[in-house]
């Protein structure tokens, strides 16, 4: 292979591997209190960023099956949301189970509200995890909404 081809392939791999590895990662609650730089380091540059209000800087990420929003101020990320779509209930349920297991390992307490609705908390962070079915598309959506808390 020529040097140009090796360079091109290397560049593609460097750009695509982080995207592929985090394609369905919805653990946005772990970024509460972290800096915008930490978010960009994990997910790359946002698709859109709104810097019009320094007290509420918003970063938006989107792929074909995943949407994420991070809201931050000078003290770090204080609100985050993620939504991932799955074509089967079992894949969505696995995502929920993995999310909960990973969160418990990170020190979060989990409270089951219903079979598809969970509240997670840890000092300084509260999050809601929900799974729902889109009756029209027959897809399943897993969403996380996290926020900084004062406890």
Residue ranges and their predicted role:
Residues 23-25:
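Boundary of Sec targeting at the N-terminus
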Residues 34-143, 147-151:
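A cross-family detector of function-defining hotspots
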Residues 1-11:
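Bacterial N-terminal signal peptides that target proteins for export
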Residues 3-4, 19-20, 76, 83:
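General secondary-structure edge motif
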Residues 2-4, 21, 111, 136:
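Intrinsically disordered/low-complexity terminal segments and short unstructured peptides
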Residues 10-18:
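Bacterial N-terminal signal peptides
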